[in-house]
């Protein structure tokens, strides 16, 4: 299954978490979608890129390690994780149309975010 399709499956899970003001562990997310936790960063990249390009709080900030309570090293959409989580909790996600598989693929292609720094991303966006 393509990563963009998996990302499209993850989106509603994350919006539900945001509405309920909850985080989701990598382990639980992996079990919910049938993917090993080690492969989730690759699947969260299109969501992170889409949120950055659309000026939305980064939904991927809600996926955290069980022990650390923090997103993995691939999360670079914001330097202040607690503030970004608070922004994601406050956002009106039920009013946002979920992105399509094609929109997620386009976002990841236009702004590949995994493995880049926040400074590099801002530079790519001209910010």
Task: Outline where the language-model segments fall.
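Nucleic acid-binding interface residues in structured DNA/RNA-binding domains
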Residues: 1-9, 15-18, 22-127
């Amino acid at each position: 299954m393509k990563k963009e399709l998996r990302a499209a499956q993850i989106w509603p899970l994350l919006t539900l978490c945001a509405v309920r003001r909850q985080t989701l562990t990598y382990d639980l997310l992996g079990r919910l979608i049938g993917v090993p936790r080690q492969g989730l960063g690759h699947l969260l990249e299109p969501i992170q890129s889409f949120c950055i390009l659309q000026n939305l709080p980064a939904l991927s900030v809600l996926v955290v390690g069980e022990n650390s309570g923090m997103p993995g090293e691939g999360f670079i959409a914001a330097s202040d994780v607690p503030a970004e989580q608070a922004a994601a909790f406050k956002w009106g996600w039920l009013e946002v149309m979920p992105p399509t598989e094609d929109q997620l693929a386009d976002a990841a292609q236009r702004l590949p975010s995994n493995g880049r720094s926040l400074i590099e991303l801002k530079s790519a966006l001209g910010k």
